[in-house]
């Protein structure tokens, strides 16, 4: 069985059809936090063929829960309403977490068939078939895409949602304050905070206010991470790319870290008993074995002095270092060596720990939260390049 595909739909007449479809009122106990305004899609068929005379696009058929949108789709087919549709595909990444990796957008979409399936001992679902005039397919991780427009002369009549009737942030028009926030992220990403602030000032309006919302003495590092991810979406919608810098907080001071992966995770609070067992295993054997193995690598021998290497060979951490979980045990992190990094305490380990604590604050056991997450790259952090740069 495939992972759930999340669908957003906006109608030219009805506005946001998918709004509220992922809530408990719409789907009962199948509701999902973070996907309240999306439709849960279980299967999708996109039929394209070519007989030698050009490609033929036969529309898309998908299966979804019967939910809040069901009567609205009947309205759409009855009134021949033009729709704008977006399908977000998820998969399990190398960290064992869900990541958005594929996207299909349809414009000029019209419903051609609806079939309800109410069968004993099965989910109540409906299968919907749609035709379309424009399709965009993007692999968000591999950065490939395809688009097709059936009738180029009709492009301007294709319905495109605006900020008044579209709940999905992907299509909202940026106001000047939002532009300021993106400029702040650009300053972090490019290591030129003052230069980007100057640009915000020159734009006028509320741009500088938006900039200062992000980069001020009260800024939380996770807000910068979020803004940086938004920055990468400007040229490639919903692509989560590798970001090489992250602004964290330590004792009220901003710290710029390099060599960071920022990913989107679904943070799920782990039961305290399970957490205690994993922490006990880590303290008893895992940390020691990780350090012994790491001490045998050329990376460690080229970095630490003889005294620190001896400590590592005995399973002890070097002075001013700690072993850090990239994905925390409090969430879905494991004790696998791939999830561990030997990290310098000041300021690096404390910055990452502060970020994780901010995200986890207020989340109860079993609750979930979709959030950006900063991960130090490699097995030893910071990267050797950063150390060399700081000594120049």
From Swiss-Prot:
Instruction: Name the InterPro entries on file.
Output: Hcp1-lik_sf, His-Me_finger_sf, HNH_nuc, T6SS_Hcp, T6SS_Hcp1_domain
Family, according to the entry, reads as follows: Belongs to the hcp1 family.
**The protein's name:** Uncharacterized protein YhhZ
Whose protein is this, by species? Escherichia coli (strain K12)
């Amino acid at each position: 069985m495939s992972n759930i595909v999340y669908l957003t739909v906006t109608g030219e007449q009805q506005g946001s059809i998918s709004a509220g479809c992922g809530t408990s009122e719409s789907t009962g106990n199948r509701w999902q936090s973070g996907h309240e305004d999306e439709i849960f899609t279980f299967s999708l068929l996109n039929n394209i063929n070519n007989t030698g005379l050009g490609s033929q696009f036969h529309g898309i058929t998908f299966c979804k829960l019967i939910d809040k949108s069901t009567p609205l789709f009947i309205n759409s087919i009855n009134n021949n309403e033009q729709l704008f549709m977006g399908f977000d595909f998820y998969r399990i990444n190398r960290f064992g977490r869900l990541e958005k990796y594929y996207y299909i957008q349809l414009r000029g979409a019209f419903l051609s068939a609806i079939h309800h399936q109410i069968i004993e001992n099965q989910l109540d679902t409906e299968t919907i078939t749609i035709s379309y005039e424009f399709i965009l397919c993007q692999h968000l991780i591999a950065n490939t895409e395809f688009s097709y427009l059936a009738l180029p002369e009709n492009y301007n009549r294709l319905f495109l949602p605006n900020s008044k009737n579209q709940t999905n942030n992907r299509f909202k028009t940026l106001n000047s304050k939002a532009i300021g926030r993106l400029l702040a992220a650009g300053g972090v990403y490019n290591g030129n905070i003052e230069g980007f602030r100057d640009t915000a000032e020159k734009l006028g309006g509320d741009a500088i206010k938006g900039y200062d919302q992000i980069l001020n003495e009260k800024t939380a590092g996770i807000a910068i991470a979020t803004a940086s991810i938004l920055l990468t979406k400007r040229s490639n919608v919903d692509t989560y790319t590798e970001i090489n810098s992250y602004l964290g907080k330590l004792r009220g001071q901003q710290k710029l870290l390099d060599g960071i992966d920022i990913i989107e995770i679904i943070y799920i609070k782990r039961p305290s008993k399970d957490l205690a067992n994993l922490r006990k295993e880590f303290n008893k054997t895992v940390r020691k074995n990780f350090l012994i193995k790491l001490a045998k690598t050329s990376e460690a021998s080229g970095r630490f002095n003889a005294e620190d290497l001896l400590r590592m060979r005995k399973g002890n951490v070097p002075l001013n270092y700690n072993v850090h979980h990239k994905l925390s045990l409090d969430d879905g992190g494991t004790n696998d060596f791939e999830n561990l990094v030997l990290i310098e305490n000041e300021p690096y380990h404390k910055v990452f720990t502060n970020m994780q604590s901010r995200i986890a604050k207020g989340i109860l056991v079993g609750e979930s939260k979709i959030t950006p997450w900063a991960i130090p790259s490699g097995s030893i952090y910071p990267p050797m390049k950063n150390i060399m740069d700081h000594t120049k």
